[in-house]
Amino acid sequence: MAGNKVETFLKSELKKKNALLFVLIDSEVSNLEASAKLAKDVEKIGASAILVGGSSATDQIEMAQVVKGIKKGIKIPIILFPGNVTGVVPDADAILFSSLMNSENPYFITQAQALGAPSVLKFGLEPLPTAYLVIGDGTTAWFVGSARGIPFEKPKIAAAYALAAQFLGMRFVYLEAGSGAKSSVTPEMVKTVRQLFNGFLIVGGGIKDVKTAQNLVKAGADALVIGTFLEKGGSLKKLEEITKAIQRSK
């Protein structure tokens, strides 16, 4: 998918479906066969994209194999979601080219991006300019990214970052409670961010049931990211229920 095909596809899916499901496959957790099967299964139940990545330092060769293996069996886009430069691999359609805006380490704000950018160009990946905001603390994303986690009960801080991202030209904001988070981002925070940010709003972390998913979409989320739920034995049937419910929620 060259040019801005993936971004255009996501926007047209959003018009049709009201809200989208992105399924995150962590290449460190899933083996090649399981990843390829999961990608096919979630495409069937209505997922709009597969994210491949993870917060910890990933084996680049392993990740490239996972992407290649998934690509053969699905039509929906594969979007890289790298935790570091090692997460930039060929064969995907796009990349969440993100800055961890509330990191205390400049490496995760601009340096990793400068190191990874030539590979993004070389591999022909479509960059989706994304402000990545870690909400709360105690998760892998918070620890690895040296994030100064935005407190769950301080939605205006998240909204200020999202507005800054918009002024910097970023068209995507990702509010991340973290992989396997005990609780999800609050609907109040999503609503507050939505009032100021007019781009594509992604919310992930701790989404395990229909009600949570519906409330986040009603508050203004465009896409929900679910990953650990499936790793920890969540059923595809439950995921299908969530997918159908969010498409009726706005």
From Swiss-Prot:
Q: What class of enzyme is it?
A: transferase
Q: What is its main location?
A: cytoplasm
Q: Which GO terms describe its cellular component?
A: cytoplasm
Which pathway, per its entry? Membrane lipid metabolism; glycerophospholipid metabolism
Q: Where in the cell is it found?
A: Cytoplasm
Stated EC number for the protein is 2.5.1.41
Q: What does this protein do?
A: Prenyltransferase that catalyzes the transfer of the geranylgeranyl moiety of geranylgeranyl diphosphate (GGPP) to the C3 hydroxyl of sn-glycerol-1-phosphate (G1P). This reaction is the first ether-bond-formation step in the biosynthesis of archaeal membrane lipids.
Q: What is this protein called?
A: Geranylgeranylglyceryl phosphate synthase
